[in-house]
Design a protein with these regions (language model features):
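Intein/HINT protein-splicing elements and their conserved insertion hotspots or analogous self-processing inserts
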Residues: 1-91, 105-210, 218
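Short helix-loop-beta junction
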Residues: 65-72, 223-235
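Short hydrophobic/aromatic beta-strand micro-patches
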Residues: 98-102, 214
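Mature N-terminal segment immediately following signal peptide/propeptide cleavage
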Residues: 210-213, 220-222, 229
Length: 235
Protein backbone atom coordinates (compact mmCIF):
# COMPACT_ATOMS: atom_id res chain seq x y z
CA UNK A 1 0.00 0.00 0.00
CA UNK A 2 1.20 3.52 -0.85
CA UNK A 3 2.08 5.50 2.28
CA UNK A 4 -0.08 8.47 3.15
CA UNK A 5 1.38 11.73 1.87
CA UNK A 6 1.21 14.63 4.30
CA UNK A 7 3.22 17.60 3.05
CA UNK A 8 1.05 18.67 0.11
CA UNK A 9 -2.42 18.13 1.56
CA UNK A 10 -4.90 20.98 1.28
CA UNK A 11 -5.04 20.77 5.08
CA UNK A 12 -1.26 21.05 5.34
CA UNK A 13 -1.21 24.00 2.96
CA UNK A 14 -3.68 25.82 5.18
CA UNK A 15 -1.09 25.50 7.97
CA UNK A 16 1.80 26.63 5.72
CA UNK A 17 3.34 23.15 5.95
CA UNK A 18 4.11 22.48 2.31
CA UNK A 19 6.61 19.87 1.13
CA UNK A 20 7.59 18.23 -2.16
CA UNK A 21 6.23 14.69 -1.71
CA UNK A 22 3.03 14.39 -3.74
CA UNK A 23 0.40 11.62 -4.00
CA UNK A 24 1.04 9.44 -7.01
CA UNK A 25 0.05 6.17 -8.66
CA UNK A 26 3.03 3.89 -8.10
CA UNK A 27 1.49 0.87 -9.82
CA UNK A 28 -0.42 1.79 -13.00
CA UNK A 29 -1.48 -1.83 -13.57
CA UNK A 30 -3.15 -1.93 -10.15
CA UNK A 31 -4.81 1.41 -10.84
CA UNK A 32 -6.14 0.02 -14.13
CA UNK A 33 -7.43 -3.14 -12.44
CA UNK A 34 -9.18 -1.07 -9.78
CA UNK A 35 -10.80 1.10 -12.43
CA UNK A 36 -12.02 -1.92 -14.40
CA UNK A 37 -13.36 -3.58 -11.24
CA UNK A 38 -15.36 -0.47 -10.39
CA UNK A 39 -16.69 -0.32 -13.96
CA UNK A 40 -17.86 -3.92 -13.59
CA UNK A 41 -19.66 -3.00 -10.37
CA UNK A 42 -21.30 -0.05 -12.11
CA UNK A 43 -22.36 -2.09 -15.13
CA UNK A 44 -23.93 -4.72 -12.87
CA UNK A 45 -25.85 -2.09 -10.92
CA UNK A 46 -24.12 -2.93 -7.64
CA UNK A 47 -23.11 0.60 -6.65
CA UNK A 48 -25.65 2.94 -5.06
CA UNK A 49 -23.27 5.90 -4.77
CA UNK A 50 -19.59 6.64 -5.19
CA UNK A 51 -17.02 9.41 -4.93
CA UNK A 52 -13.33 9.67 -5.67
CA UNK A 53 -10.80 10.51 -2.95
CA UNK A 54 -8.76 13.48 -4.16
CA UNK A 55 -8.49 17.12 -3.09
CA UNK A 56 -9.34 17.38 0.59
CA UNK A 57 -8.94 13.68 1.30
CA UNK A 58 -11.31 11.06 2.69
CA UNK A 59 -13.26 13.35 5.03
CA UNK A 60 -14.01 15.74 2.16
CA UNK A 61 -15.20 12.80 0.05
CA UNK A 62 -17.56 11.61 2.79
CA UNK A 63 -18.91 15.10 3.40
CA UNK A 64 -19.48 15.77 -0.29
CA UNK A 65 -21.45 12.52 -0.54
CA UNK A 66 -23.81 14.01 2.08
CA UNK A 67 -23.96 17.61 0.86
CA UNK A 68 -26.53 17.03 -1.88
CA UNK A 69 -29.34 16.04 0.49
CA UNK A 70 -30.85 17.51 3.64
CA UNK A 71 -31.23 14.38 5.77
CA UNK A 72 -29.02 11.62 7.12
CA UNK A 73 -25.35 11.14 7.79
CA UNK A 74 -22.77 8.41 8.36
CA UNK A 75 -21.09 6.38 11.07
CA UNK A 76 -17.50 5.67 10.04
CA UNK A 77 -14.92 3.38 11.65
CA UNK A 78 -11.26 3.75 10.68
CA UNK A 79 -10.06 0.94 12.92
CA UNK A 80 -9.35 -1.42 10.01
CA UNK A 81 -6.99 1.11 8.42
CA UNK A 82 -3.43 0.39 9.54
CA UNK A 83 -2.33 4.03 9.74
CA UNK A 84 -2.46 5.52 13.26
CA UNK A 85 -2.33 9.20 12.33
CA UNK A 86 -5.95 10.37 12.07
CA UNK A 87 -4.94 13.52 10.17
CA UNK A 88 -3.24 11.49 7.46
CA UNK A 89 -6.18 9.11 7.15
CA UNK A 90 -8.78 11.86 6.87
CA UNK A 91 -6.87 14.38 4.76
CA UNK A 92 -4.38 12.39 2.64
CA UNK A 93 -5.10 12.82 -1.07
CA UNK A 94 -3.82 9.44 -2.26
CA UNK A 95 -6.03 8.19 -5.12
CA UNK A 96 -8.97 6.09 -3.99
CA UNK A 97 -12.73 5.72 -4.17
CA UNK A 98 -15.59 5.36 -1.69
CA UNK A 99 -18.64 3.38 -2.80
CA UNK A 100 -21.97 2.59 -1.17
CA UNK A 101 -23.58 -0.80 -1.75
CA UNK A 102 -26.69 -2.55 -0.47
CA UNK A 103 -26.25 -5.27 2.13
CA UNK A 104 -27.73 -7.84 -0.24
CA UNK A 105 -24.96 -7.09 -2.76
CA UNK A 106 -21.98 -6.89 -0.44
CA UNK A 107 -20.80 -10.49 -0.94
CA UNK A 108 -20.94 -10.13 -4.73
CA UNK A 109 -19.06 -6.83 -4.52
CA UNK A 110 -16.40 -8.35 -2.27
CA UNK A 111 -15.92 -11.26 -4.68
CA UNK A 112 -15.47 -8.98 -7.69
CA UNK A 113 -12.92 -6.84 -5.86
CA UNK A 114 -11.04 -9.83 -4.47
CA UNK A 115 -10.97 -11.63 -7.83
CA UNK A 116 -9.43 -8.48 -9.31
CA UNK A 117 -6.89 -8.29 -6.49
CA UNK A 118 -8.22 -4.95 -5.24
CA UNK A 119 -7.83 -4.05 -1.58
CA UNK A 120 -10.79 -2.54 0.26
CA UNK A 121 -11.98 -1.62 3.75
CA UNK A 122 -15.54 -1.45 5.06
CA UNK A 123 -15.83 2.08 6.41
CA UNK A 124 -19.30 2.35 7.89
CA UNK A 125 -22.99 2.84 7.25
CA UNK A 126 -25.57 5.61 6.67
CA UNK A 127 -27.52 6.93 9.66
CA UNK A 128 -30.54 9.15 10.26
CA UNK A 129 -28.53 11.70 12.28
CA UNK A 130 -27.31 14.73 10.33
CA UNK A 131 -23.61 14.36 11.03
CA UNK A 132 -20.63 12.15 10.28
CA UNK A 133 -19.23 10.30 13.28
CA UNK A 134 -15.69 9.03 12.78
CA UNK A 135 -14.22 6.47 15.18
CA UNK A 136 -10.53 5.64 15.50
CA UNK A 137 -9.43 3.66 18.51
CA UNK A 138 -10.92 5.18 21.65
CA UNK A 139 -11.61 8.55 20.02
CA UNK A 140 -14.75 9.69 18.21
CA UNK A 141 -14.95 12.79 16.01
CA UNK A 142 -18.16 14.53 14.96
CA UNK A 143 -18.54 16.55 11.74
CA UNK A 144 -21.67 18.66 11.26
CA UNK A 145 -22.70 18.21 7.62
CA UNK A 146 -24.83 21.32 7.10
CA UNK A 147 -22.37 23.61 8.89
CA UNK A 148 -19.43 22.26 6.90
CA UNK A 149 -21.37 22.51 3.65
CA UNK A 150 -21.72 26.25 4.28
CA UNK A 151 -18.00 26.48 5.02
CA UNK A 152 -17.21 24.41 1.92
CA UNK A 153 -19.29 26.69 -0.32
CA UNK A 154 -18.16 29.99 1.24
CA UNK A 155 -15.09 30.32 -1.01
CA UNK A 156 -17.22 30.01 -4.14
CA UNK A 157 -19.59 32.62 -2.71
CA UNK A 158 -16.75 35.09 -2.10
CA UNK A 159 -15.51 34.61 -5.66
CA UNK A 160 -19.05 34.91 -7.05
CA UNK A 161 -19.44 38.30 -5.34
CA UNK A 162 -16.57 39.62 -7.43
CA UNK A 163 -17.82 38.10 -10.69
CA UNK A 164 -21.58 38.71 -10.52
CA UNK A 165 -23.89 41.69 -9.97
CA UNK A 166 -27.14 42.71 -8.29
CA UNK A 167 -26.78 40.37 -5.34
CA UNK A 168 -26.88 37.22 -7.48
CA UNK A 169 -24.12 35.57 -5.45
CA UNK A 170 -26.04 36.05 -2.22
CA UNK A 171 -29.25 34.69 -3.76
CA UNK A 172 -27.40 31.66 -5.09
CA UNK A 173 -25.69 30.74 -1.83
CA UNK A 174 -28.97 31.22 0.04
CA UNK A 175 -30.73 28.78 -2.30
CA UNK A 176 -28.03 26.11 -2.30
CA UNK A 177 -27.51 26.09 1.46
CA UNK A 178 -31.22 25.93 2.33
CA UNK A 179 -32.65 23.55 -0.23
CA UNK A 180 -32.17 19.96 -1.20
CA UNK A 181 -30.10 20.13 -4.40
CA UNK A 182 -31.97 17.23 -5.92
CA UNK A 183 -35.19 19.28 -5.78
CA UNK A 184 -33.73 21.70 -8.31
CA UNK A 185 -35.07 19.48 -11.05
CA UNK A 186 -38.01 17.14 -11.57
CA UNK A 187 -37.69 13.52 -10.43
CA UNK A 188 -38.88 12.41 -13.87
CA UNK A 189 -35.88 14.13 -15.40
CA UNK A 190 -33.22 12.78 -13.09
CA UNK A 191 -30.16 11.20 -14.75
CA UNK A 192 -31.23 7.80 -13.42
CA UNK A 193 -34.40 8.01 -15.51
CA UNK A 194 -32.82 9.10 -18.79
CA UNK A 195 -33.64 5.78 -20.44
CA UNK A 196 -37.36 6.25 -19.63
CA UNK A 197 -37.52 9.93 -20.54
CA UNK A 198 -37.78 12.02 -23.67
CA UNK A 199 -35.11 14.23 -22.10
CA UNK A 200 -32.11 12.21 -23.28
CA UNK A 201 -28.50 13.41 -22.88
CA UNK A 202 -28.57 14.44 -26.56
CA UNK A 203 -31.67 16.57 -26.00
CA UNK A 204 -30.09 18.14 -22.92
CA UNK A 205 -26.95 19.04 -24.85
CA UNK A 206 -29.01 20.45 -27.69
CA UNK A 207 -31.00 22.65 -25.30
CA UNK A 208 -27.90 23.78 -23.47
CA UNK A 209 -26.20 24.67 -26.76
CA UNK A 210 -29.03 27.13 -27.50
CA UNK A 211 -28.12 29.15 -24.42
CA UNK A 212 -25.16 31.38 -23.75
CA UNK A 213 -23.98 29.16 -20.92
CA UNK A 214 -21.00 29.94 -18.72
CA UNK A 215 -20.11 27.51 -15.95
CA UNK A 216 -17.47 28.61 -13.47
CA UNK A 217 -15.71 25.99 -11.39
CA UNK A 218 -13.08 26.98 -8.83
CA UNK A 219 -10.23 24.62 -7.86
CA UNK A 220 -11.40 22.02 -5.33
CA UNK A 221 -15.06 22.89 -5.99
CA UNK A 222 -17.45 20.02 -6.56
CA UNK A 223 -19.10 19.95 -9.98
CA UNK A 224 -22.61 19.37 -8.66
CA UNK A 225 -23.19 23.13 -8.19
CA UNK A 226 -22.86 24.13 -11.87
CA UNK A 227 -24.56 20.91 -12.94
CA UNK A 228 -27.58 21.65 -10.75
CA UNK A 229 -27.66 25.20 -12.10
CA UNK A 230 -27.91 23.78 -15.61
CA UNK A 231 -30.76 21.47 -14.63
CA UNK A 232 -32.67 24.28 -12.97
CA UNK A 233 -32.33 26.41 -16.10
CA UNK A 234 -33.64 23.65 -18.36
CA UNK A 235 -36.70 22.59 -16.40
Amino acid sequence: MTSYVWEVLAFAQSLNKVGDDVPTVQNPEYFRDAFLAVQELVNKGLIMAGHDISAGGLITTLLEMCFSNMEGGMEISLNKIKEDDIIKILFAENPGIVIQVKNKHKEEVKKILEDAGIGYVKLGKPTEERHILVEKGDATYQFGIDYLRDVWYSTSYLLDRKQSMNGCAKKNVSRTTRNNLWNLYSTNHSPANFHNSALTPTVVLRQVSKRLLSVKKEPMANAKWPICSIWQDLM
